[in-house]
Regions:
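Flexible, low-hydrophobicity surface segments
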Residues: 1-50
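Active-site-proximal alpha-helical scaffold in enzymes
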Residues: 2-6, 150-160, 189-198
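Short acidic, glycine/serine/threonine-rich loops at helix termini
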Residues: 12-15, 119-121, 144-150, 179-185, ...
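Helix-loop-helix junctions that connect adjacent transmembrane helices in secondary transporters/permeases
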Residues: 38-126, 291-372, 499, 576-587, ...
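Glycine-rich loop/linker segments at domain edges
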Residues: 51-97, 186-272, 350-360, 426, ...
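C-terminal catalytic domains of large/alpha subunits in multi-subunit enzymes
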Residues: 127-132, 161-168, 197, 223-347, ...
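Thiamine diphosphate
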Residues: 139, 143-165, 169-170, 386-394
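Catalytic phosphate/nucleotide-handling subdomain of diverse soluble enzymes
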Residues: 351-415, 421, 431
């Protein structure tokens, strides 16, 4: 419905009557996969969108398969099941876009992470040339993956063509955001492991079933990424077998969300590690240290290499901060209704999407008349602090102060260089390489122009906004050089540089979380007393922003662990809590002090030794809290969230109530 104003549109909607043919509600993936289940899409009669089955190459041994290892009586055998829930991104700004026609072209202003991709999808959807579409992303904040999908912009672009090119605003409410945009996939994991007496993982298997809701969205890629992450963090000495299913149901369709399947798999693998350690009487920290991904590890399927790792140092640093050894001993064998525990979890996370998908980014630099530099990017700032870091990178590559770099903080596909956008913790790694490359080219152009002005000088360099010679003598300021370049009758030139980084490498970021909790058993209440994340994200470009990024991710992880869940009426399939009153996000009043620590490594594949940090802080929080509850109570809770009702049921089943 398109109307002059919102009131008219609402009145018109009330005049529309829709008749629905009701079908049985299928909300769970297991229901949808059962024989005789209603078929949601005719092209997938079993409701399975996709399936994958991966086996690592087996070394020469007496074992012919992973299953043989998992049945070998010489090893300790573990089996378990872990389930995660559906949650929403809850970015403060809901999806919104404006569309109008200008000079025969469609202009769309939208809150998006991927403006260049939005333009392409609009063109494909409408069957028109991409050059006849202009997409503008203003300076906005918040997306977490939900604005990585093109949902409303093609509709809005089409609507403006139906009203004579007039401006159309498509503003999505919070309730519509919950119901009709994307969310995090609920995924179930059935896992098995074989472990020898020296705490070494010999083999593991994982079967993951992802609830895709009614539409494909990112499809199978998220659960595929999840089982890949399950394989990578720890080393299997003999072999690994993973199977993954993506299944259609009647839920709202999940899609990309911070971590892209890794928070789900991390809950499974880190709960499994603690459960094994508890059954064997091992220290969970020592068990993890005995099995970490080694430096130089190469994934057997995608070839991603571990170029640097500080994970062992992260674990020790976090353990020292929380007082791991002392608290583990102190909190053993507790009694009473209120108990405390300490838990941990580790993670690995790749940086960007290569080699699974394209990784490319471009940058442009333009000399201003006062000697400062204009930086143009297609990479998007969505609140993560990217523009600040990009300015720092450009300044370092050129050799000028950061305040002399003026970044264009919005993207316009008519003028911005191409970049695929903000997702996969890629921008400081992929776009950063483009910035470094262009910055070095720009620097050489400045020095080459200075050499024309001072042909007898040698060893030219840029220092403190000056061109200096090999002896360190100042020859000309950058401001004067710029004025000369613009207005000299003999040497006028507009100094610019532009280039592309087609990234064909990847690397792993690492880290861990330690949490101390207090559990009120009779009421099922978990209070986080202390929590610390320790990250190896390579070299930190901006430590203050890095700390802020970690704090935000930890907050999101606490909600994932304890309170957040999209709930549905099992009879009708209706979402019951699609608003910020009934959907329980934690606030600052629910958090302890959030501590972020770092172990800096110098990753040789990163533009400045840096690697992923955007998504990782969320990943290990939920399993660390769950494992702390396990130590406090002795009860293994294998589903998220750890809500009071669920905990009371589990504690009752465990004989504590």
């Amino acid at each position: 419905m398109v109307a002059e104003d919102e009131i008219t549109a609402r009145r018109a909607l009330e005049l529309i009557r829709v008749e629905y043919e009701e079908y049985p509600v299928v909300l769970e993936a297991e229901q949808a996969m059962a024989e005789g289940a209603p078929v949601l899409h005719e092209e997938h009669p079993d409701n399975v969108l996709a399936k994958m089955d991966l086996r690592t190459p087996m070394p020469e041994s007496d074992f012919h398969s992973v299953e043989d290892v998992l049945a070998c009586p010489a090893y300790y055998q573990f089996r378990g099941r872990y389930d995660t829930q559906q949650v929403q991104h809850c970015h403060i700004e809901n999806p919104i876009s404006y569309a109008w026609m200008e000079g025969g072209r469609i202009v769309v202003v939208t809150s998006t992470q991927i403006p260049h991709i939005v333009r392409r999808v609009i063109g494909q959807a409408m069957g028109i040339g991409w050059g006849s579409i202009r997409v503008i992303k203003p300076y906005i904040g918040g997306g977490f993956g939900n604005k990585q999908e093109v949902l409303y912009e093609p509709l809005n672009a089409w609507l403006t063509t139906q009203v004579g090119g007039r401006c159309v605003r498509l503003d999505v409410s919070r309730e519509e955001t919950f119901q009709n945009t994307r969310s995090r996939h609920p995924i179930s994991f059935d896992v098995a492991a074989a472990v020898d007496g020296d705490m070494r993982l010999m083999a593991r298997s994982c079967t993951a079933v992802s609830n895709q809701g009614g539409y494909a969205s990112h499809g199978h890629s998220i659960v595929a990424n999840a089982v890949t992450g399950f394989r990578q963090l720890y080393l299997d000495r003999i072999g690994h077998h993973s199977t993954a299913y993506t299944v259609y149901t009647n839920r709202p369709a999940p899609g990309a969300m911070r971590g892209y399947g890794i928070p789900q798999c991390n809950f499974a693998v880190e709960c499994m590690m603690d459960d094994i350690a508890r059954e064997k009487g091992w220290d969970p920290k020592a068990f993890r240290l005995a099995n970490l991904m080694p430096l130089g590890y190469v994934d057997p399927f995608n070839g991603i290499t571990c170029h640097s790792t500080g994970l062992a140092e992260c674990i020790e640093k976090g353990a020292d901060f929380i007082g791991w050894a002392e608290l583990r001993e102190k909190y053993q064998n507790q009694t009473g209704p209120v108990r405390r525990g300490v838990g941990m979890a580790c993670f690995s996370y790749k940086t960007g999407v290569y080699p699974i998908s394209l990784e490319t980014a471009s940058a442009r630099m333009v000399l201003n008349q006062d000697g400062t530099v204009q930086l143009h990017l297609g990479a998007t700032e969505i609140g993560q602090g990217g523009d600040t870091v990009f300015s720092q990178m450009a300044a370092q590559a050129i050799g000028i102060p950061t305040e002399d770099v003026h970044i264009v903080s919005f993207q316009d596909t008519d003028t911005a260089p191409f970049d695929t956008g903000a997702y996969a913790s890629r921008q400081t790694y992929v776009t950063g390489k483009a910035i470094k490359k262009v910055g070095e080219e720009f620097r050489e152009k400045l020095l080459a122009y200075a050499a024309e002005l001072f042909p007898d000088a040698s060893g030219l360099d840029i220092r403190e906004r000056q061109i200096v010679d090999g002896a360190g003598e100042a020859l000309i300021s950058l401001a004067d050089l710029a004025m000369t370049a613009f207005y000299s009758l003999e040497h006028s030139v507009h100094i610019t540089a532009e280039d592309t980084n087609h990234c064909k490498e990847n690397t792993f970021a690492f880290g861990c979380c330690f949490a101390e909790v207090e559990v009120d058993i009779p009421v099922g209440k978990v209070r986080v007393l202390r929590i610390v994340n320790v990250h190896d994200s390579g070299k930190l470009i901006n430590p203050a922003l890095a700390e802020a990024q970690v704090h935000g991710g930890m907050s999101m992880g606490i909600g994932y662990a304890l309170t957040e869940e999209m709930k549905f009426d099992p009879k009708t399939g209706r979402l019951l809590n699609g608003n910020l009153l009934d959907y329980k996000m934690p606030t600052s009043m629910d958090h302890p002090e959030l501590t972020a620590l770092f172990v800096e490594t110098d990753d040789p594949s990163g533009p400045f030794g840096n690697k992923a940090l955007g998504e990782p802080p969320t990943i290990p929080v939920a399993p660390a809290i769950r494992n702390a509850v396990l130590q406090a109570t002795g009860v293994a809770v294998n589903t998220l969230p750890l809500s009071p009702q669920k905990l009371v049921e589990e504690f009752t089943r465990g004989g504590l109530i």
